[in-house]
C-alpha cells in the first residue's frame, strides 16, 4: 500500500514535520532521570547496610523491610527509565536514516518537471514527422523492379516497412526464381500476420528501438520516485 502513496506526500510529511529534536531531548532527559534514580537507590542501600546492625526490635525490622521494598522499586524504576530512553534513541536513529533516504520535495518536483520536459521534447525523435515517412510507404531497393500486383502491394498499409537490401542483387535472375515464381527479395517473413517478401518492419529499426529504450528509462525513473529512495 505504501507504493500507492504519492512521493510528494511522504516527502512533505518527513521534511515539514517537527524532526527528531524533541525525541532526542526526551532521550537525554530520561537518561539523566535514570542516573538520578540509580544514584538514589545506591545511596539508600549504603545507608541501610550501615544501620542494619544498630537496629533492634520489631519497629526497626518493619522500617528496614519498608526501606528494602522502596529500594527494590527504585532499582526497577531506574531500569525501566533506561529502557525507555534506549527505545527513544532507536526511534531517533530510524528517523534520521529515513530522512537520508527520502528525496526532498523540491528535488521530486524538479525531477518530475524534467521527465515531462523530456517526454514533450521527445529526444529520441520518434514523433518528428520530418524524420519519418508516411504510413504505408515503402522504400524499395534501388535498381529493382516490383510488379504492381506483387507481394509488396498486399502488405498492411498501417505497417511502415523498408525493403531490406539483398546481398548479391546483381546475380543471375534465374537463380532467384523458385516454386512460387520470381522473388524480388530472398526469404519470407511475417509482417502483422501477413506473408510477404524479406522485409524489415519499422519495429526493427534503430529509431524504434531508441524510442523503446527511452520509454523504458522514463518508467524506471517513475518507479524509483515511487520507491522513495534517494541515490547515494
From Swiss-Prot:
- According to its record, what are the GO cellular component terms? plasma membrane
Q: Which InterPro entries match?
A: PPE_dom (IPR000030), PPE_sf (IPR038332)
Under Pfam families, the record lists: PPE (PF00823)
Annotated region (Disordered) at 123-147, 169-200
Extract the SUPFAM superfamilies matched here: PE/PPE dimer-like
Q: Which Gene3D superfamilies match?
A: PPE superfamily
Q: Name one GO biological process term.
A: response to host immune response
Q: Which family does it belong to?
A: Belongs to the mycobacterial PPE family.
PANTHER family to which the protein is assigned, alphabetical? GLUTAMINE-RICH PROTEIN 2 (PTHR46766:SF1)
Q: What is this protein called?
A: Uncharacterized PPE family protein PPE58
Q: Which gene specifies this protein's sequence?
A: PPE58
Amino acid at each position: 500500500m505504501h507504493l500507492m502513496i504519492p512521493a510528494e506526500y511522504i516527502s512533505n510529511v518527513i521534511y515539514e514535520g517537527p524532526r527528531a529534536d524533541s525525541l532526542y531531548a526526551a532521550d537525554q532527559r530520561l537518561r539523566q532521570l535514570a542516573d538520578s534514580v540509580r544514584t538514589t537507590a545506591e545511596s539508600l542501600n549504603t545507608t541501610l547496610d550501615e544501620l542494619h546492625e544498630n537496629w533492634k526490635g520489631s519497629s526497626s525490622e518493619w522500617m528496614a523491610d519498608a526501606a528494602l521494598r522502596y529500594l527494590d522499586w527504585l532499582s526497577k524504576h531506574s531500569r525501566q527509565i533506561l529502557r525507555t530512553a534506549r527505545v527513544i534513541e532507536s526511534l531517533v536513529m530510524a528517523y534520521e536514516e529515513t530522512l537520508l533516504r527520502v528525496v526532498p520535495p523540491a528535488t521530486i518536483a524538479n525531477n518530475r518537471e524534467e521527465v515531462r520536459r523530456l517526454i514533450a521534447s521527445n529526444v529520441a525523435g520518434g514523433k518528428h514527422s520530418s524524420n519519418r515517412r508516411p504510413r504505408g510507404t515503402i522504400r524499395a531497393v534501388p535498381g529493382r523492379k516490383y510488379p504492381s500486383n506483387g507481394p509488396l502491394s498486399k502488405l498492411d498499409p498501417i505497417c511502415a516497412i523498408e525493403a531490406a537490401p539483398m546481398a548479391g542483387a546483381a546475380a543471375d535472375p534465374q537463380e532467384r526464381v523458385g516454386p512460387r515464381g520470381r522473388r524480388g527479395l530472398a526469404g519470407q517473413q511475417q509482417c502483422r500476420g501477413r506473408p510477404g517478401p524479406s522485409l524489415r518492419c519499422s519495429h526493427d529499426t534503430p529509431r524504434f528501438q531508441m524510442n523503446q529504450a527511452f520509454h523504458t528509462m522514463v518508467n524506471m525513473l517513475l518507479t524509483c520516485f515511487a520507491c522513495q529512495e534517494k541515490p547515494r
